[in-house]
């Protein structure tokens, strides 16, 4: 294991910077300046390669989360995405449902207005000078084919 030694130095101004004069020995020059403090810290550094030998499950970087926290973060992220998708889907679909309901309402009003023309049988709808019957009854195929023939009408399936 290689050990390396390093020194960290920091120079900062003192809390109460007062002007002071210093006379150098042997010179007649005076130096005016602010009071400064110097901090030195000695650091012992080890080779990073020696730390990585052996146990790969240790975490040497601060940015990596241990597995339980990482798993929790992933689950919460997925839940957040699902909730956002649900909210967006709701925002988009609610106006569409409202438009469909309005269209259905206006279609029902037109059908009610069309019924009051007079020349079509009761429960029939007049549209473009023709009469139409929209049935909701359940009938067999033979009954559906014979029913319009008996009334001298044409059958149309949509």
Curated annotation (Swiss-Prot):
The keyword Transmembrane helix applies. GO terms for biological process: positive regulation of natural killer cell mediated cytotoxicity; stimulatory C-type lectin receptor signaling pathway. It is a single-pass type II membrane protein. Residues 96-158 are extracellular. Residues 1-74 are cytoplasmic. Changing residue 29 to S: In allele NKG2-F*02. Residues 1-25 are annotated as: Disordered. It comes from the Eukaryota. One of its GO terms (cellular component) is external side of plasma membrane. The chain crosses the membrane at residues 75-95. It is found in: Membrane. One of its GO terms (molecular function) is transmembrane signaling receptor activity. Gene3D superfamilies: Mannose-Binding Protein A, subunit A (3.10.100.10), YojJ-like (1.10.287.770). Keywords: Disulfide bond, Membrane, Receptor, Signal-anchor, Transmembrane, Transmembrane helix. Can form disulfide-bonded heterodimer with CD94. May play a role as a receptor for the recognition of MHC class I HLA-E molecules by NK cells. This is NKG2-F type II integral membrane protein. It comes from Homo sapiens. The gene is KLRC4.
